[in-house]
């Protein structure tokens, strides 16, 4: 049996379902590029039929990813399959991932079909997908609650039809490891043409066993694991791929398999996705949590100092976790900043050096010395900025008055031409600034979430503000970064206003296209 395990990442499709606000095309591309850089084999980049935005994201990513294989999801509907193929048409090689429920519960209560009809739908859709690519994956939704007889029957027919990858999802995270292992064993035992296809598993974490189930499936013969970085996903999440990958590496003696993953890119990829998705990593998270390599017990600390292997089964450097000693000040030049960015794993194409250096100098003037975590935070904000933002904050001031009230004055540059000023008194400085900015744009928004996170150490640490607003029943996310909390809060709101403005522009273009087509 092949000892290579294919890693299938669905952060951009299944993982995005956990987010309160959709990611922009640029953010999705950043994630896809980081996954490609980490050596991910298959990147499921979206569900193109679901929205024009998802279609555009898949289309854009397909044009830019060269080393990983692109994959899109489709239901057993011709329009889904055709749209998926169209969105990925610029890629030399791509996969179409079709799914259909096979459990009795889903067939009777959701689909209102019998099993013969399910097989006919599945085979018809596979034939449709094979018109576009020879790489077709089929997922038997709710496979872990499908009868073994039915599962074996449909898998055999799918392989005969030309499916190269059969996915066995534990859709609701119901299975336990030995149960999933038995399912995989039975498929290998009872399906005569099973050797003509790769068996994959897609485990959810509702009972906290997604990683354990995935490992047991590997031991039973599965050779593709589906999941997300940091385990993000709806409900309790998906299989955390970084945990499976490192389990395979550390316990190769037991599992006897390997992956194509560049292990030293794991930590950076995890951090990028955490920041872009605005989903903080718990400190005790395996592999990538801030406490994963921390030792507080005196006995443990003494043991680690004598020999790290006493209490560490892997080195921090094995996932790319290393401390970069920075000594940057306002006298440091562009070359020094570029050098340290390279040391931290960034490529020159990842960021705009002119904009990053300008932000660096402003911070260096305030703090004196810039540390690695400062530069990392600045780089993240730099990478989020679009080439041309419609709104930009040119001035703000806040004055606190009696009874907890504050007055804010702002000047907003609109379209790089028109400068508009506004002033408002409200409860607290941040709300006053938000009210003043909203007076200018007149967007009917409601603030739903405000989060402040320190990016660094000490009193002069950078503060990152993440906000979530609702605008016309849609959620929009914004982020700002500064040593001053009020300034970072203002930047976050301007970021939101730009995101809303861009969404409105897209909607206007779609309306125009519909009128032309009609």
From Swiss-Prot:
Q: Which HAMAP family match?
A: LeuA_type1
Assembly description: Homodimer.
Pathway named in the protein's UniProt entry? Amino-acid biosynthesis; L-leucine biosynthesis; L-leucine from 3-methyl-2-oxobutanoate: step 1/4
Please report the organism this UniProt entry assigns to the protein.
Buchnera aphidicola subsp. Schizaphis graminum (strain Sg)
Instruction: Describe the reaction catalysed, as an equation.
Output: 3-methyl-2-oxobutanoate + acetyl-CoA + H2O = (2S)-2-isopropylmalate + CoA + H(+)
- This chain's protein is named 2-isopropylmalate synthase
Recorded hits in Gene3D superfamilies, A to Z, give: 1.10.238.260, 3.30.160.270, Aldolase class I
Required co-factors? Mn(2+)
Q: Which UniProt keywords apply?
A: Amino-acid biosynthesis, Branched-chain amino acid biosynthesis, Cytoplasm, Leucine biosynthesis, Manganese, Metal-binding, Plasmid, Transferase
One Gene Ontology CC term in the entry: cytosol
Entries under InterPro entries matching the protein: 2-IPM_HCS-like, 2-isopropylmalate_synth_dimer, AIPM/Hcit_synth_CS, Aldolase_TIM, LeuA/HCS_post-cat, LeuA_allosteric_dom_sf, LeuA_bact_synth, PYR_CT
| GO terms for biological process, alphabetical | L-leucine biosynthetic process
SUPFAM superfamilies xref list: 2-isopropylmalate synthase LeuA, allosteric (dimerisation) domain, Aldolase
Q: Which GO terms describe its molecular function?
A: 2-isopropylmalate synthase activity; acetyl-CoA C-acetyltransferase activity; manganese ion binding
């Amino acid at each position: 049996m092949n000892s290579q395990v294919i890693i299938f990442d669905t952060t951009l499709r299944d993982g995005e379902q956990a987010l309160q606000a959709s990611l922009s095309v640029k953010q999705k591309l950043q994630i896809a590029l980081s996954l490609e850089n980490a050596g991910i084999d298959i990147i499921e980049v979206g569900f193109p039929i679901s929205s024009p935005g998802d279609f555009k994201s898949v289309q854009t990513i397909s044009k830019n990813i060269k080393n990983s294989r692109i994959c899109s999801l489709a239901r057993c509907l011709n329009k889904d399959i055709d749209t998926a193929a169209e969105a990925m048409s610029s890629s030399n090689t791509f996969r179409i991932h079709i799914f259909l429920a096979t459990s009795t519960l889903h067939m009777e209560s959701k689909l209102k079909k019998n099993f013969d009809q399910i097989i006919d739908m599945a085979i018809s859709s596979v034939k449709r997908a094979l018109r576009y690519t020879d790489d077709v994956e089929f997922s038997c939704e709710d496979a872990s609650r499908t009868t073994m007889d039915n599962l074996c029957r449909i898998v055999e027919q799918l392989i005969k039809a030309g499916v190269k990858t059969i996915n066995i999802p534990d859709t609701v995270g119901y299975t336990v490891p030995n149960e999933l292992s038995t399912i995989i064993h039975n498929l290998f035992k009872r399906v005569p043409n099973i050797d003509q296809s790769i068996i994959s598993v897609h485990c959810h974490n509702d009972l906290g066993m997604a990683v354990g189930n995935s490992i047991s499936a590997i031991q039973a013969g599965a050779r593709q694991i589906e999941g997300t970085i940091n385990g993000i996903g709806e409900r309790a999440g998906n299989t955390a791929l970084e945990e499976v990958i490192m389990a395979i590496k550390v316990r190769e003696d037991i599992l006897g398999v390997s992956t194509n993953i560049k292990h030293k890119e794991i930590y950076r990829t995890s951090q990028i996705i955490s920041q872009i998705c605005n989903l903080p990593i718990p400190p005790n998270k395996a592999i990538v949590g801030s406490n994963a390599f921390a030792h507080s017990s005196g006995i443990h600390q003494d043991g680690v100092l004598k020999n790290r292997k006493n209490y560490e089964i892997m080195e921090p450097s094995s996932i790319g976790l290393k401390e970069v000693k920075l000594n940057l000040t306002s006298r440091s030049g562009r070359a020094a900043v570029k050098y340290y960015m390279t040391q931290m794993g960034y490529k020159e194409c990842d960021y705009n050096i002119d904009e990053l250096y300008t932000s660096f100098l402003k911070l260096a003037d305030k703090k004196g010395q810039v540390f690695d975590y400062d530069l990392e935070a600045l780089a993240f904000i730099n990478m989020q900025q679009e080439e041309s933002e419609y709104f930009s904050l040119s001035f703000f001031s806040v004055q606190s008055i009696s009874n907890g009230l504050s007055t804010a004055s702002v000047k907003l540059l609109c379209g790089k031409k028109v400068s508009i000023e506004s002033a408002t008194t409200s409860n607290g400085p941040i709300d006053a600034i938000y009210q003043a900015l909203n007076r200018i744009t007149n967007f009917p928004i409601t603030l739903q979430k405000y989060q402040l996170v320190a990016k660094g150490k000490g009193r002069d640490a950078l503060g990152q503000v993440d906000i979530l607003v609702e605008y016309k029943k849609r959620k929009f996310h914004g982020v700002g970064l500064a040593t001053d909390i009020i300034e970072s809060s203002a930047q976050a709101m301007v970021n939101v206003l730009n995101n809303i403005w861009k969404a409105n522009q897209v909607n206007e273009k779609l309306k125009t296209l519909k009128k032309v087509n009609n």
